[in-house]
Amino acid sequence: MWLTFNQVARRRRPLAPRRRRWRRRYWXRRRRIPANRRGHRTNRVYRFRFVREFGQVLQKGTGGSQLSFGTDGINIILDDFLDWGTINWRLPFEDYRIRLAKVEMRPLNESWEEWKGFGHNVPIQDNHLEDFFKKTRLDADPLANWDGARKWDLRKGFKRLFKPRPQLSVTDTDAANVTAALWLNNPKSLWIPIMKKSDQNLPSSGTRVKHYGLAFSWPEPTPNQMDYQVKVTIYCEFRQMNLTHLATPK
């Protein structure tokens, strides 16, 4: 007797349900740090923010029909942000680097009806920045065609973020005329030692390394000059805390 497929399927013994196997979860064990590496480590980075404020004067123009321009710039030096005063104290770190800078410029009680105009601001990360310091009576805006230039309104001011770069080609402000390239223990990381061995001077040599910088231009206002408040904020990183730097080195 031949059976159909459906009849054969009914007569087959049903399979027992498969038992589910419960696997024990693997809990990642906490990695234990050796006793000699606990606490402060050499790769720990400390981040600080420093603020500096000062006044900026835009000198007035000649008042004729010919439009004239002025330019100026800002260099970043860590020592300018540290209020040393008369106290002989030092930073308790070995190295530092400036990761970011922010420049804010706002007018002080100026009449918006007297003068209207706009200039440009641009980060310049080499020695060409100093070519624009304290320049007046220019026939054209020298920063208008720079790569990265942004327009700013004289009535409102501006805010600009940029990454400062330490000087590498010209001599440092150190008395020994040490180039800033000698301060860098790794050209990629740009960590700058805060002071040299047996450094007795305050401020320390490392904090005087110059960082470039932001240049800005403006049409010279008429009939009066314009006063601005400039606020510079830098974001620094320090590493290798060393409390022995707080005392005068021998």
From Swiss-Prot:
<keyword id="KW-0946">Virion</keyword>
<keyword id="KW-0945">Host-virus interaction</keyword>
<dbReference type="GO" id="GO:0039615">
    <property type="term" value="C:T=1 icosahedral viral capsid"/>
</dbReference>
<dbReference type="Pfam" id="PF02443">
    <property type="entry name" value="Circo_capsid"/>
</dbReference>
<keyword id="KW-1048">Host nucleus</keyword>
<keyword id="KW-1164">Virus endocytosis by host</keyword>
<keyword id="KW-0238">DNA-binding</keyword>
<comment type="similarity">
    <text>Belongs to the circoviridae capsid protein family.</text>
</comment>
<keyword id="KW-1140">T=1 icosahedral capsid protein</keyword>
<feature type="region of interest" description="DNA-binding">
    <location>
        <begin position="1"/>
        <end position="39"/>
    </location>
</feature>
<dbReference type="GO" id="GO:0075732">
    <property type="term" value="P:viral penetration into host nucleus"/>
</dbReference>
<dbReference type="GO" id="GO:0003677">
    <property type="term" value="F:DNA binding"/>
</dbReference>
<comment type="subunit">
    <text>Homomultimer. Assembles in the nucleus, presumably in an immature form, then migrates to the cytoplasm once assembled as mature virion. Interacts with Rep; this interaction relocates Rep into the nucleus.</text>
</comment>
<dbReference type="InterPro" id="IPR003383">
    <property type="entry name" value="Circovirus_capsid"/>
</dbReference>
<feature type="region of interest" description="Nuclear localization signals">
    <location>
        <begin position="9"/>
        <end position="42"/>
    </location>
</feature>
<dbReference type="GO" id="GO:0043657">
    <property type="term" value="C:host cell"/>
</dbReference>
<dbReference type="GO" id="GO:0042025">
    <property type="term" value="C:host cell nucleus"/>
</dbReference>
<dbReference type="InterPro" id="IPR038652">
    <property type="entry name" value="Circovirus_capsid_sf"/>
</dbReference>
<keyword id="KW-0167">Capsid protein</keyword>
<dbReference type="GO" id="GO:0075509">
    <property type="term" value="P:endocytosis involved in viral entry into host cell"/>
</dbReference>
<comment type="function">
    <text>Self-assembles to form the virion icosahedral capsid with a T=1 symmetry. This very small capsid (17 - 22 nm in diameter) allows the virus to be very stable in the environment and resistant to some disinfectants, including detergents. Essential for the initial attachment to heparan sulfate moieties and chondroitin sulfate B of the host cell surface proteoglycans. After attachment, the virus is endocytosed and traffics to the nucleus. The capsid protein binds and transports the viral genome and Rep across the nuclear envelope.</text>
</comment>
<keyword id="KW-1161">Viral attachment to host cell</keyword>
<dbReference type="GO" id="GO:0019069">
    <property type="term" value="P:viral capsid assembly"/>
</dbReference>
<keyword id="KW-1160">Virus entry into host cell</keyword>
<keyword id="KW-1163">Viral penetration into host nucleus</keyword>
<keyword id="KW-1162">Viral penetration into host cytoplasm</keyword>
<dbReference type="GO" id="GO:0019062">
    <property type="term" value="P:virion attachment to host cell"/>
</dbReference>
<protein>
    <recommendedName>
        <fullName>Probable capsid protein</fullName>
    </recommendedName>
</protein>
